[in-house]
Each structure stands twice: as C-alpha cells, then as structure tokens.
A protein has these predicted regions:
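Short amphipathic alpha-helical coiled-coil/interface segments
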Residues: 2-9, 201, 221-229
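A common structural junction motif
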Residues: 87-95, 202-213
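Non-catalytic beta-strand/loop surface segments
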Residues: 12-66, 90-135, 146-195, 216-228, ...
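Helix N-cap motif at beta-to-alpha junctions
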Residues: 73-78, 190-192
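Zinc-dependent metallopeptidase catalytic helix centered on the HExxH motif
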Residues: 137-139
Length: 281
C-alpha cells in the first residue's frame, strides 16, 4: 500500500483543487482534525509509516460496535443475517472504544485569506462554516445553496453565469459530521481579476441576506429538492447511502425521514434570517 499512497500524495501536490480544498479546511478548522490533518497525511508521514500503529488503529476502530452494515434491496432478511454472520461474525467488539473529544472551533472574527500557487487557471473560493450534517441548520443550508445555485435558475445562475459576468460560478454545501461548509467558487474571464469575481459572488450573498429574491424561488427549489430525493430513493444504492450517512453523521433516523417535511415549511423570512446569521463577510 505504501507505494500507491506516496504516488497519490505526490499527485495531490500538483492538483490545484486538492490544494485549495485542504487550504479551505485548514482555514475553517484550525483546531479540528478536519483542518489540522489531511486524508493522505504529510510527506513525512508516508516516508516511514508505522505498521504497528496501523494495526493498532485497525484493532481499535474496525470493530462491530463502531461499524454499520447498511443494506437495501429485495433480499430475505433471515438469509441475509446468516450471510452477514458468515463473513463478519468473527469480529470482536472493542469494549473500550475511545470517545473522541474534539476541539470546538471558535467563531471567526475576520476573513482568512490564503493564496495557492499552481498550474491551473486562476479561480477563487469562498467558504463559510456551519453546524454539522445532523443539524437542522444543515437542512436549511441545502435549500440556501439551491437558491444561490442550481445550474438553472439560482441567483448565481441568473445574475452571473447567464449574463456572462464571469467565466463560471457556482456553490455547493459540504456535509460532514461535526461541521458543514458552504463553498462558492468562481473563475474570471480574460482581463477580470479575482477580486472582481469575489465581488460578484458576495453580491449574490447580499441579495440573499436582504431578501432580494422571488419567494417563488424558495418554493421551486424545495420542489426540486423533493424531486431529486424521490429519484434517489428509486435506487437501492442511494437508499443504502442514506443509512450510511445517518450512521456516520450521528443523526436520528426519525429526523432523516422527516427532514423533507421540515424543509418544506421553511419561509423566506427564515431563509433571510439564516443568511444574516451565517453568511457574513
């Protein structure tokens, strides 16, 4: 495994999106593992990995009382239990499974600005930190993100992309267990500066905070969200993934299945209040 990991790490060092992503997380989470370490680790980590530490890590965490087997499909539950027992029944629980006491991030009082150098065309990324994926705030964030950008008729679509004010612009939410993130990204046209693109993106945030958008946009995006969820639920893979996400994020399954009902009741005033609370400069 060591050689592929080193190759992947070396490749990541030349990929601007990866470097930007890691810089964003390091800026938003200076005290949390989301920002203090990366999935691949450092070059120093990969030079001389400890096999003993790897084995101990597996022994500690890869245990039945820290694992979920998520299934969806047309199967006989009785036969499936036998199959699961056959392949996973040998695993022993860790009765001393550690509890992760991770540092809580303090509120950011000023923008954190980082410049990344690389071979790709220049672009700008803006990011805001939110509560984790199991929170009610993340439910609202998903709708807010759709109002801003949905590749058709969001604020960014209508006011930036369709008017060709920048080469491209978009936003999307990033869901994680302890925190979530809203990312906005834009690419400048020839002769346009990154600060100008930043201004365009922030202008759409200001419109959201001021309530300068049609209330029908909220209703339409909620309906689109419903449609997307219905289409996902037609696939066994998507249904099983919902179980996985709920397990990883530590959410109550009852909250998961009623999330759409709550999201459907969101009002424009609630969206505006949410934007003013979290989407500041």
């Amino acid at each position: 495994l060591r050689v592929p990991e080193i190759v992947e790490k070396n490749m990541s060092l030349t990929r601007d999106p990866r470097k930007v992503y890691e810089a964003v997380l390091a800026s938003l989470f200076p005290h949390h593992p989301y920002g203090t370490q990366t999935v691949l680790g450092t070059q120093e980590d990969l030079k001389n990995p400890s096999i003993t530490n790897i084995k101990n890590y597996k022994k500690t965490w890869y245990v039945p009382n820290n694992i979920a087997i998520c299934l969806s499909g047309d199967f006989d539950p009785g036969k499936m239990i036998v199959t699961i027992d056959k392949y996973f029944g040998h695993m022993k629980p860790n009765m001393n499974l550690p509890k992760l006491n991770l540092a809580k991030e303090e509120a950011l009082t000023a923008p954190v600005v980082k410049e990344i150098l690389g071979p790709d065309a220049e672009n700008i990324t803006l990011a805001w930190r939110f509560p984790g994926a199991a929170s009610k705030e993340y439910e609202t964030l998903q709708i807010v993100s759709q109002i801003l950008y949905n590749d058709k008729a969001g604020l960014i679509d209508l006011n930036i992309n369709q008017q060709q004010k920048a080469l491209s612009a978009y936003c999307y939410p990033l869901d994680m267990a302890d925190y979530s993130v809203l990312l906005m990204q834009g690419r400048p046209k020839q002769g346009q500066t990154l600060d100008e693109v930043k201004g365009l993106l922030l202008e759409e945030i200001k419109k959201l905070r001021a309530g300068d958008f049609d209330e029908k946009m909220l209703e339409a995006n909620i309906n689109n969200f419903k449609l997307g969820l219905m289409q996902q639920l037609e696939k066994n893979e998507s249904r099983a993934q919902m179980f996985v996400n709920s397990f990883i994020n530590g959410s109550n399954w009852a909250d998961e299945v009623t999330a759409l009902e709550r999201m459907s009741k969101l009002t424009k005033s609630e969206i505006v209040a949410f934007a003013n609370k979290y989407l500041n400069e």
